[in-house]
Amino acid sequence: MIALWSSLHAAFISQFFMELNMHGIRYFVLRNYEGLPETNSGKDVDVVIAPGTYHKVTGILKGIMQNFNIYYFQISKFETMRCWYIMDDAQHFAIHIDIIENEVYKGFQYFDFEYLYANVIPYKDFYVLNKTMDTVLLLAQNIIAYKRLKDKYRRTITQNYLQSNE
């Protein structure tokens, strides 16, 4: 099922961020967050959480699903990332949220959560990395994981670099 981002998506992700904040979960959203919660330019929402808080985050997500009468989900795990696929055919709703406990690639942790979290800033009602650290992380991820820099990320890194020097 393919679902376009709707007001239901906006309400769901807003509730998720609000619950994370209310429960004192330290987190931040990676990339493509500028339109959230109203729109989403990416195909998913990447949320990095403090290590050891995944079970609490699971409870939060399941509670939100129940509030929205959504009962189907699937989780795929890759190292410290869990990809949540949450959907409801009757409501024409599907959302993909990646919950990441640490930035790890093939067992190599390239940034500690505490180091990254020291570079977090508020954005609307949720948290994101500042542009400098976002750029550094994007560059490191591409070099380590892909051994090359994708064109779309070249543009983002260039824009962030130019903005930081203005």
Q: Which residue stretches match the model-derived regions?
A:
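Conserved NTP-donor binding/palm subdomain of two-metal-ion nucleotidyltransferases/polymerases, i.e.
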Residues: 1-43, 49-166
